[in-house]
Amino acid sequence: MDQTSLNHQTEFDIIRSHFKDLTHQKDVEKGIGDDAALVKFNSEHNNHLVVATDTLIEGVHFPNTAGAFDIAQRAMCVNLSDLAAMGAVPRWFTLGLTLPINLAQPEWLGQFSAGLKIIADQYDCALIGGDTTRGPLSVNITMLGEVPLQEAMCRDGASIGDIVYVTGFLGDGAAALKNELEKPQPSDVVRESERLFNRFYRPTPRIKEGLEIRSIATACIDISDGLVADLEHLCRSSNTSANVSIENLPIHPEVKKHYPEQYSDFALFGGDDYELCFTVPESKNLVMGELIESRSVNAVPIGKIIKSNGSGSRVLLNGRVCNSIKTGYKHFE
């Protein structure tokens, strides 16, 4: 492999060859190629601009065996998940890509841009700028979207008596990471690992669900660090606590089968699920039930918002204080 190819490809060559096709959208006046992007934003609609950013670093957020296509899709999906938690519609994104010289090759960059494009097209958002530089592999995406005024879901609106819901399945992300780190695996786990592999690298951003629930949910957060940790963040912002019924957690049958001793911990503390955890007042619970029955929203109730005692905001599990040692993923620990 030509170790000097990064010198032969300028930043502008890389952009022109691999990322130019991601910029086409009617509301993008000037995308990549200028000092800054210029986009049309119709303030007459009285929408908030929603901005979310995440950095994914090799060896911290994805294994060093991950392929370019998969890294790109994971980076897109986890950022879109933040917009989903706000009830926002994605519009644009920027990309900060740091590459070691051995990866700055047409094949790797082509796979990476192909992964970006599939997700960008699926969620109708355009690349409008960014930066490329040499260094250890990391991907930073800043996602921009919009949401009507007074309709954004935040973390601070939960009230005592609200029902706690989660979308999708919990524990898949932790099970997937365990699979990735423990290869080779028994053949029965390998057959299941394709679903888990996709759940890790392509978690479904719950944009549709966010739009459906934003008019009835009182608070929302996406589950990146683990249900208990993220629900505790929500409770702390709302000055409340929560009680979760462990038996109500939605866990995929295959995860239960392959990890009978660990699936509860995966669901509660594992993280990387990128599902939505949200609260709905009892007065709107019938409406929520109709959304679930019509399959507009794939979600289940798992608990209730309760009053905090003198110890501050907590998440109880079946009425008992959670083991603080297992409070979810923390960066750099």
Where do the model's predicted regions map?
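Polyanion-binding loop/helix "lid" in catalytic or ligand-binding cores
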Residues: 190-233
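Small-aliphatic-rich amphipathic alpha-helix that forms the alpha element of a beta-alpha
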Residues: 70-94, 111-122, 206, 212, ...
